[in-house]
């Protein structure tokens, strides 16, 4: 399945299937395997199951929460993580291509098509395949065919505005038979700046993710401290087996779910050029 098809489908429905997730995974990596499924099922399942058990010590309720956590991990977290990794790798490959292509064009002995051939050879994954198709489409093509070939490439990567501008300049170079190197260098500089911003943004999010993991550990320690400070039997009878404990735990779990949902929304929002309404 093509990535463009995947993107169109994911905008229309909440969950995606394994084939669609795999389309992202194989674009710049290996296909989904058993370890991927186990990882995204076991970790969220254990976190929700163990945490609910520490609050109420009801095994069957913890089992239900554990199953819910596993489903959430497979249906929500796994697609988001894989899609985010795809977008990161795709952008880095585009940035590498822009830098390689500009460097090659700076050499007067290199023609545009020769530079495109060499730059595509240095690329990897999905972008490499797209560049090979573009190169094959423009070689010996008339003006209309060149326009159509670049239009298809541009439509696929239109979310990367700077890269789209770079493609427009390459299209002009092919049609006019001359290279506007200074303009290409300016676009390359801007794309490099975007990469630096994205990398810095990702580092900040990784730091917040570490803080989130630490917070979860602190919460577990806090719950255990309360449990053993009152005595295990007292905690069970006065809280875990009491309606007050059920209501309090229900409210607490609900608040934690909302907090986690807000955090994951922030974590997987990598757009730094758009302002949300």
From Swiss-Prot:
Bilayer disposition of the protein: Multi-pass membrane protein
Subcellular location: Cell membrane
Keywords: Cell membrane, Membrane, Plasmid, Transmembrane, Transmembrane helix
Transmembrane region(s): 37-59, 63-82, 214-236, 246-268
Gene Ontology cellular component annotations, sorted alphabetically: plasma membrane
Claim: Ligase is one of the keywords in the record: no
Coarse class of the protein's main subcellular location: membrane
Protein name per its UniProtKB record: Uncharacterized protein pXO2-23/BXB0022/GBAA_pXO2_0022
């Amino acid at each position: 399945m093509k990535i463009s098809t995947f993107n169109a489908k994911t905008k229309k429905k909440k969950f995606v299937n394994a084939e669609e997730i795999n389309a992202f995974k194989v674009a710049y990596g290996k296909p989904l395997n058993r370890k991927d499924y186990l990882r995204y099922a076991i970790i969220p399942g254990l976190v929700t199951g163990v945490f609910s058990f520490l609050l109420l010590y009801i095994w069957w309720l913890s089992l239900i929460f554990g199953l819910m956590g596993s489903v959430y991990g497979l249906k929500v977290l796994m697609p988001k993580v894989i899609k985010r990794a795809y977008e990161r790798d795709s952008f880095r490959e585009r940035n590498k291509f822009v830098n390689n292509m500009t460097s090659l064009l700076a050499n007067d002995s290199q023609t545009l098509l020769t530079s495109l051939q060499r730059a595509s050879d240095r690329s990897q994954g999905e972008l490499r395949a797209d560049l090979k198709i573009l190169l094959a489409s423009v070689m010996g093509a008339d003006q209309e065919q060149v326009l159509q070939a670049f239009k298809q490439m541009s439509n696929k990567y239109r979310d990367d505005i700077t890269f789209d501008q770079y493609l427009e300049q390459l299209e002009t170079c092919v049609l006019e038979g001359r290279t506007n190197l200074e303009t290409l260098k300016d676009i390359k500089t801007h794309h490099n700046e975007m990469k630096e911003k994205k990398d810095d943004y990702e580092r900040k999010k990784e730091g917040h993710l570490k803080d989130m993991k630490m917070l979860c550990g602190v919460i577990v320690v806090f719950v255990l401290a309360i449990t053993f400070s009152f005595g295990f039997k007292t905690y069970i009878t006065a809280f875990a087996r009491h309606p007050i404990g059920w209501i309090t735990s229900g409210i607490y779990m609900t608040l934690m779910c909302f907090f986690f949902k807000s955090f994951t929304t922030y974590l997987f929002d990598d757009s730094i050029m758009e302002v949300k309404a």
